[in-house]
């Protein structure tokens, strides 16, 4: 195999969480608090605004939410995260299982909490990763810091060139570049031209399907 270790993002790479949780909770909030704005946000437009200028700007500048209202919206999100398990993308479990069966290492580097990542893997019957770097680690070590990859290399006696990062967004790309690892953009979760254009221009690989990830790491 070309790579000895795959570092997987979680949201929109392994599980369809933006569509099923983040966007869904946002729409639920709007339906209750600002129903006239629901029509303004498709899933793709929501993801584009998350990419740029960012979710805080969306809430504060575009929707004009006060700090109190932002806290209220967050409660909707927390309720969805705690009570709903996002669906894993078809074929991702088989890739993880076969890669590990061949001696590969599967790591997760995500801005989700470790307990939710573990739950999602278990409920979707995915093989458990070897190590998880979630939101629980110190702030300075989270993506886009290269710390996760450097720690992996030390733990498993790897060089960065033996590591492939798979992520749908820029923090994962920045982490990979800072550590000297290759980066594959996970382009199967949504169709947002601005994100795709950026990722195609900067990534080592741009993958439009889980099947393409399989070809890259197993064939």
PLM features per residue range, with description:
Residues 2-94, 98, 115:
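N-terminal helical cap/lid subdomain that shapes the substrate entry/recognition surface
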Residues 14, 106-109, 165-166, 206:
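Conserved SAM-binding loop
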Residues 88, 109, 141:
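Residue-level marker of regulatory loop/turn positions in helix-turn-helix DNA-binding domains and
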Residues 46, 86, 108, 162-164:
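Residue-level marker of alpha-helix boundaries and capping positions
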Residues 31-38, 102, 124-128, 157-158:
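Short helix-capping segments at alpha-helix termini
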Residues 1-4, 114, 118-219:
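Asp-based, Mg2+/Mn2+-dependent phosphohydrolase catalytic module
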Residues 73-74, 95-122, 132-133:
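Substrate-recognition element of Asp-dependent hydrolases with the DxDx(T/V) motif
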